[in-house]
Amino acid sequence: VLFRSLAPDTGGAGRRRGGMGAEVALTISIPQAEALVMTHGLEVPNSVGLSGGQPGGVIAQSLAKDFLAHAGDRPAVRPLDADDHRDFAPLGPKPGAFPMTSADVFAVTWQGGGGIGDPLDRDPDDVVADVRRGVVSRHAAETDYGVVLRAEVSAAGFARSPST
């Protein structure tokens, strides 16, 4: 395992935000092998939202061929980081068997829980706290919760978008 963490923006938006999914990146410890991955929830989320809440995110799985051979002094592998994400090719819901080498990196992000209640009813202070902790991105704060963040995020660093 090269990396594992909770994944931002994977819990469904809601007055009560859904729990976060996780992400993991791994490689094999032998020179080469055939890998087989089977998942459910890649195209349609399994965890629905309730009472106006949004569903949790769908599963994402990808493969970066020869990633470690060309990684150089890159920081730790984290598939959702913009700098490294371009190297990962999506595998789709049922890729079948595929070859892997010890230089390849397989990454998967699994879904979080569904949200409960209208996301616009979530307390803006809670949304700001979610952004500060890396649970929700600034983009999701604005598009899902209607909370527009200022450049500096502080306990009072929010403003509702004009549409709410």
Question: Each PLM stretch: what is its role?
Answer:
Residues V1-T164:
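Glycine/proline-enriched, intrinsically flexible loops and inter-domain linkers
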